[in-house]
Design a protein with these regions (language model features):
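Extreme N-terminal basic, low-complexity initiation segments
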Residues: 1-9
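Generic detector of N-terminal low-structure segments
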Residues: 8, 18-21
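N-terminal polybasic/positive-inside topogenic patches
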Residues: 9-13, 27
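C-terminal amphipathic/interface module of NAD(P)-dependent oxidoreductases
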Residues: 35-40, 340-365
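Rossmann-fold NAD(P)H-dependent dehydrogenase/reductase core
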Residues: 40-282, 359-365
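C-terminal helical subdomain
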Residues: 45-49, 294-335, 345-352, 360
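Short glycine/proline- and charge-enriched loop/turn segments
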Residues: 229-238, 285-292, 331-334
Length: 365
């Protein structure tokens, strides 16, 4: 195929939409002197970054399908994970169920961590014919209950000596404030503290492995709390808003992923956001948003693709600690407000905040 010649792109200096202009400008001015393959890759990158800057098309099924087409993505089923053990939390519906289905065809040995035994049994029965590895193993746990997480980790440690991938997917957006058995706001408990404890306990089994955390594009709206002013990850009851609390927890997940990568170089850590996917969680928690965006929402399978890909791809095509969407590294901030909050002091306070929760629990055992 003969590629068209590209003339240098002249970008207006006015800041009509700075992010969009920067994304479009990318490296097009250099295409004149590059080879065909470089031209293809550069144009693909430009399109992807433009979609990302525009948000709505980038997060929707439009962005997914355009990127899949221009990237000529390898099917998840083409990866060979025979002999690899993958732990997935929250596998009974939505993204988690689709990740389990996609990875079943790779030959991976799946460990499904779920709170509902009956729902997990249904998933296991349905994906068993797809499995080319061992039949999936069920481990019961409520990720917002630290005692339940500890028991699940003990069960995993008793059955396995090594884990290749741990996928933190479990969680939900709660519209009313709920408290975990350990007295922690439930969104923070299930999305942040529970996964932090599980990672800590399973880390000896994850040497040479990878931890994948499923965040959300909603985290772009949230800065880190101002811990010096007495704020924590938990919103007080008189100011509680489910979507805002969810975004705070999702921001914490991404920041902690970067910090885990610095703390534990023997294990790879990545986080990602799936875009806007039509899952039971979206249908139940934010029905108004779904009604408006229904025509452009991704399927749960499309939203799950990058999760499964990050579990399967070797070597990791990026640094440990990186943040992904649609098989590409993405920025962790889109606004000066959230970037300004991301300081060394705030990060140290975040780590201490979560460590204190976990230490308080482990000392009480």
């Amino acid at each position: 195929m003969k590629m068209p010649r590209f003339t240098p792109l002249v970008v207006p200096t006015q800041r009509i939409n700075e992010n969009y202009i920067v994304a479009l400008r990318c490296d097009l001015t250099y295409l004149w002197h590059t080879d065909q393959m470089t031209q293809i890759k550069t144009v693909s990158s430009c399109i992807s970054r433009a979609l990302d800057a525009a948000v709505v098309p980038g997060f929707s099924k439009i962005g997914y399908r355009v990127r899949q087409w221009i990237g000529n993505w390898q099917a998840i089923s083409d990866f060979d994970l025979r002999g690899k053990t993958v732990v997935i939390t929250g596998p009974t519906s939505g993204l988690g169920e689709q990740v389990a289905r996609q990875l079943a065809a790779t030959g991976a040995n799946l460990v499904l961590v779920a709170r509902n035994k009956e729902k997990c049994a249904r998933v296991i029965d349905e994906i068993a014919p797809l499995c080319t590895g061992n039949k999936p193993v069920f481990i019961q746990a409520e990720m917002g209950d630290l005692e339940s997480v500890r028991s699940a980790c003990t069960a995993i440690q008793q059955q396995f000596t090594h884990l290749d991938v741990l996928i933190h997917n479990a969680g939900a957006l709660l519209n009313t404030r709920q408290i975990s058995p350990q007295g922690i706001e439930q969104t923070v408990a299930s999305h942040v503290v529970g996964p932090f404890l599980m990672t800590t306990l399973l880390l000896p089994l994850l040497v040479g492995g990878r931890v994948v955390t499923v965040s959300s594009g909603g985290m772009y709206t949230s800065p880190l709390p101002i811990f010096d002013n007495g704020e924590t990850l938990e919103m007080p009851a008189n100011k509680y808003a489910g979507s805002k609390q969810y975004a705070i927890a999702k921001r914490a997940q991404v920041t902690l992923t970067e910090m885990w990568a610095a703390h534990e170089p023997q294990t790879e850590f990545v986080s990602m956001h799936p875009g806007w996917a039509d899952t039971p969680g979206v249908q139940e928690s934010i029905p108004g948003f779904r009604r408006i965006t229904a025509p452009i929402l991704r399927s749960a399978s499309e939203g799950a693709d990058t999760i499964a890909w990050l579990a399967a791809v070797q070597p990791l095509p990026g640094e440990s600690g990186s943040f992904w969407s649609d098989r590409e590294i993405r920025p962790t901030h889109k606004s000066p407000r959230t970037k300004k909050s991301d300081t060394k002091t705030a990060r140290a306070a975040l780590w201490k905040n979560i460590s204190d929760y976990v230490d308080s629990f482990t000392q009480s055992i």
